[in-house]
């Protein structure tokens, strides 16, 4: 039987660190998670306008950080216990996709954020196909014939045999696998040049951009942004 606990802890631990161990959801304290969100902006793929809007609107950013953290906590905890595994696997897929597109380019020594994102996507897809295993709450509910497990929707949201025709199931597996393979190669190439050409790492070498330069009454003023490097603002 498969064990989804490591991927579950990956997401639940993010919730635990921000809420239980420290208060990283308070904008007035050091280590506020919203500050780290700035680092995603320069090279985010596909969701850059969303990140830019949130960075420029602190109230909206805070609300989204709270929602994101709560979702991570619920999804992670449910996955660890194997409860409503399939619907939670969709949550894993979505969270991982956000990490991949937003911060997949970040990593000073290895492709750590990219790896977290792409492995989360693959794991979410596999968990949806298989459901949870023997040592899960889903299996406990089914084994003891709880009424909820008799509902048609439980196989889609929980575990058990997927109600997909046997002739169609291989196509679902193939299409999903090809999509994930495509995302793997595409993002690895865009973020790191890992498929062909010259390797690059935009997290290592800092890059500064100077804008709005002007001289007023013999005083020079300008805006400086660090757009590439370990931390960017």
Regions found by a protein language model. Give the residues of each.
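Extended, low-polarity transmembrane helix blocks
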Residues: 1-53, 58-70, 83-233
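Transmembrane alpha-helix interface/packing and boundary motifs in multi-pass membrane proteins
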Residues: 75-84
């Amino acid at each position: 039987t498969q064990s989804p606990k490591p991927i579950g802890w990956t997401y639940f631990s993010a919730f635990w660190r921000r809420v239980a161990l420290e208060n990283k959801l308070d904008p007035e304290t050091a280590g506020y998670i919203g500050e780290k969100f700035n680092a995603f902006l320069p090279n985010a793929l596909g969701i850059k306008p969303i990140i830019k809007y949130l960075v420029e609107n602190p109230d909206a950013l805070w609300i989204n950080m709270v929602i994101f953290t709560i979702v991570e906590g619920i999804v992670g905890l449910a996955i660890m216990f194997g409860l409503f595994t399939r619907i939670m696997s969709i949550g894993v897929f979505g969270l991982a996709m956000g990490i991949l597109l937003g911060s997949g380019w970040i990593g000073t020594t290895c492709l750590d954020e990219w790896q977290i994102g792409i492995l989360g996507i693959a794991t979410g897809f596999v968990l949806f196909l298989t459901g949870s295993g023997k040592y899960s709450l889903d299996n406990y509910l089914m084994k003891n014939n709880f009424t909820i497990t008799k509902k048609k929707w439980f196989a889609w949201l929980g575990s058990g045999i997927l109600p997909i025709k046997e002739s169609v199931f291989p196509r679902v597996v193939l299409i999903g696998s090809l999509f994930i393979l495509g995302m793997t190669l595409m993002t690895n190439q865009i973020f790191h040049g890992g498929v062909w050409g010259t390797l690059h790492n935009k997290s290592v070498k800092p890059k500064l951009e100077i804008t709005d330069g002007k001289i007023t009454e013999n005083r020079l003023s300008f805006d400086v942004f660090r757009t590439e490097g370990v931390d960017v603002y």
